[in-house]
Amino acid sequence: MEYLTIDDLKNEARKKVPKAFHDYVLSGSWTESTLKDNSDDFKKISFRQRVAVDISNRNTRKSMLGTDYRMPVALAPVGLLGMQKADGEILAAQAAESFGVPFTLSTMSICSIEEVARNTSEPFWFQLYVMRDHAFAKRLVERAKAAECSALVLTLDLQILGQRHADIRNGLSVPIKIKMSNVFDLISKPNWCFEMARSKNRT
C-alpha cells in the first residue's frame, strides 16, 4: 500500500497494532486539552510562498547543537515506541539517520540506549525525565554519555503523572502487564505478536 498522508499511516497502525498501544500514542492526559492545543498550533504553521526568485541554491541544511543536519527538525521522544513495532526505537533512529535528522530516544523506551547505539552509526539525542531518584537519573546520563549521545533533552513536567483515561480503559500500565481483558486484542494481531517474539529487546 502507498502511504500519502499521516492519516494513511494512522489507519494502517490501527489495523496492525493492539488497541492499548495504538491508543497510547494518540491520547493524552485528563481532558487532552494540551494535546488538542498542540495539534491546533501545528495547523497554524504555514509556508510563505516566494515567487520570481532564484531557487537553484535552496538548502534546508541547518546546524543544531554543533551538528549539521539536512533540515532543522528532530524526531521527538515517544514512550513505548518499541510496542508499536518490534525494535521500534531502532527503526526510528535508523530512519532519522537516513534522512539526516536527529532522533531522540525516550526514557520510557523499550529498546535500551546501548541497543540503539549498537544499531546506528550516528549519535542520537536522549530524553531524560527530571525525577526524584537522582541516582537513577545519574545512571541514565552516564549510559547516554557512554553511548555517545550528542544531546540531553530534559522533560520537566513529571512532578505529577497525568491521568490517561485511554490507558486506564485499556488496562495499560508500566511495567507492561498482559491481562485477560486485552489478550483477545493481542491474538487478533498475529503479525505484531510474531514480530515482538523476534525483536532484539524483549525486556
Language model segments and positions:
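Active-site mouth loops of central-metabolism enzymes
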Residues: A74-A86, F126-A135
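N-terminal active-site wall of soluble small-molecule enzyme domains
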Residues: R61-P72, L81-A93, S109-S121
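Conserved, mostly hydrophobic/aromatic
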Residues: P18, L75, A96, L154
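Alpha/beta enzyme core
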Residues: A93-Q94, N119, A135-T203
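Hydrophobic faces of well-ordered beta-strands that scaffold small-molecule active sites
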Residues: V73-A76, V101-L105, F124-L128, L152
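A structural-propensity feature for long, helix-poor, extended segments
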Residues: I113, T120-D133, L140
